[in-house]
């Protein structure tokens, strides 16, 4: 029904404003459909520790559930797919798949492998950056610069959400 008890974000907040905006985009997207969702239910955890994203995120999610036993409908947002792996490991280890959704950033191999393995019921999406396609938009932009044309100061490919519905279009199962 779309109702949440909490959003738990595990990210490298010390990495800067752009990353903070990416994480807040998860919240903002949800609030487009459910505008009454309180920002007080968004819990942000720094995830730049030395143990790595997978281990850190697993601990963050496990500790959050332990400390908030009455929160049963939770979205975990991570700034990369390694964090998504940690969240999935925690959720599966606690036997709470029906209580969680994971949204990550990257659309990289860890996400692709888990979706192809049928884990899309929990890990529902990852923002795809597709760095392997950067040349498709960078080369024309660079040629315009070399030819003296006015170009935007910054360029970025369009990002989108990879899900079980579209993953084979971009990354077919091997």
What are these regions (language model features)?
Residues 1, 29-36, 60-67, 90-94, ...:
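Structured segments of extracytoplasmic/periplasmic soluble domains
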Residues 1-5, 21-22, 54-58, 84, ...:
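Hydrophobic alpha-helical segments within soluble ligand-binding/sensing domains
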Residues 1-37:
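Extracytoplasmic substrate-binding proteins
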Residues 5, 72-75, 124-125:
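Conserved acidic residues
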Residues 6-9, 31-54, 158:
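Short beta-strand elements in bilobed, periplasmic/extracellular small-molecule ligand-binding domains
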Residues 10, 18, 129-174:
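Hinge/cleft segment of the Venus flytrap/periplasmic-binding protein
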Residues 11-12, 118-132:
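Short beta-strand elements at the ligand-binding edges of bilobed clamshell
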Residues 26, 41-114:
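Hydrophobic alpha-helical
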């Amino acid at each position: 029904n779309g109702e949440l008890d909490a959003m738990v974000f595990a990210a490298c907040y010390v990495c800067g404003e752009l990353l903070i905006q990416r994480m807040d985009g998860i919240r903002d997207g949800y609030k487009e459909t459910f505008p009454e969702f309180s920002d007080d239910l968004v819990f942000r955890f720094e995830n730049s520790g030395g143990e790595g994203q997978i281990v850190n995120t697993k601990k963050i999610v496990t500790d959050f559930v332990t400390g908030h036993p009455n929160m049963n409908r939770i979205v975990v947002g991570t700034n990369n797919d390694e964090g998504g792996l940690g969240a999935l490991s925690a959720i599966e280890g606690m036997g709470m798949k029906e209580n969680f959704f994971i949204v990550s950033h990257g659309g990289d191999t860890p996400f692709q492998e888990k979706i192809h393995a049928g884990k899309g019921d929990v890990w529902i999406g990852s923002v795809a950056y597709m760095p392997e396609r950067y040349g498709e938009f960078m080369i024309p932009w660079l040629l315009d610069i070399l030819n003296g044309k006015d170009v935007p100061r910054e360029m970025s490919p369009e990002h989108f959400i990879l899900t079980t519905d579209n993953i084979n279009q971009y990354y077919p199962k091997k």
